Amino acid sequence: MSVTIDDVTYIAELARLRFSDDEALKMTDELNTILHYVDTLNEVDTEGVLPLSNIHDQKNVLRADEEHEPIANAAALSNAPDSQDRFFRVPKVLG
């Protein structure tokens, strides 16, 4: 299958696009290059090859979660430059 300049012009009209003659010719060449590549991929023998979603065998490479004791409220507030009651005080950001 190949794309002609008439095909590109027709598709451009459907998409409400405007191409100059040079742009349409370039688009024709680029689309034909893509289609040639797809034809090359279609020639590859994939008989007996299982479909893959990932080329790696690794499933989950993240570390395991480890439970830790939470920091006490008083300890957290002791590191804050300013606090009020049980809360951090920060400068007002919005007007």
Swiss-Prot record:
Enzyme class of the recorded protein, top EC level: ligase
**Would the keyword Nucleotide-binding turn up in this protein's UniProt record?**
yes
The UniProt record lists the keyword RNA-binding: no
Show the coiled coil region(s).
none
GO BP annotation list? glutaminyl-tRNAGln biosynthesis via transamidation; regulation of translational fidelity; translation
Disulfide cysteine pairs (residue numbers): none
The record's GO molecular-function terms, alphabetically, read: asparaginyl-tRNA synthase (glutamine-hydrolyzing) activity; ATP binding; glutaminyl-tRNA synthase (glutamine-hydrolyzing) activity
What SUPFAM superfamilies does this protein's entry cite?
Glu-tRNAGln amidotransferase C subunit
Superkingdom per UniProt = Bacteria
Q: Which Pfam families match?
A: GatC
Q: Which UniProt keywords apply?
A: ATP-binding, Ligase, Nucleotide-binding, Protein biosynthesis
Q: What is its EC number?
A: 6.3.5.-
Catalytic reaction list = L-glutamyl-tRNA(Gln) + L-glutamine + ATP + H2O = L-glutaminyl-tRNA(Gln) + L-glutamate + ADP + phosphate + H(+); L-aspartyl-tRNA(Asn) + L-glutamine + ATP + H2O = L-asparaginyl-tRNA(Asn) + L-glutamate + ADP + phosphate + 2 H(+)
* Listed Gene3D superfamilies: Glu-tRNAGln amidotransferase C subunit, N-terminal domain
Protein family membership: Belongs to the GatC family.
Role description: Allows the formation of correctly charged Asn-tRNA(Asn) or Gln-tRNA(Gln) through the transamidation of misacylated Asp-tRNA(Asn) or Glu-tRNA(Gln) in organisms which lack either or both of asparaginyl-tRNA or glutaminyl-tRNA synthetases. The reaction takes place in the presence of glutamine and ATP through an activated phospho-Asp-tRNA(Asn) or phospho-Glu-tRNA(Gln).
Give the record's subunit note: Heterotrimer of A, B and C subunits.
List the protein's name: Aspartyl/glutamyl-tRNA(Asn/Gln) amidotransferase subunit C
Organism this protein belongs to:
Chlorobium phaeovibrioides (strain DSM 265 / 1930)
Upper lineage is: Bacteria, Pseudomonadati, Chlorobiota, Chlorobiia, Chlorobiales
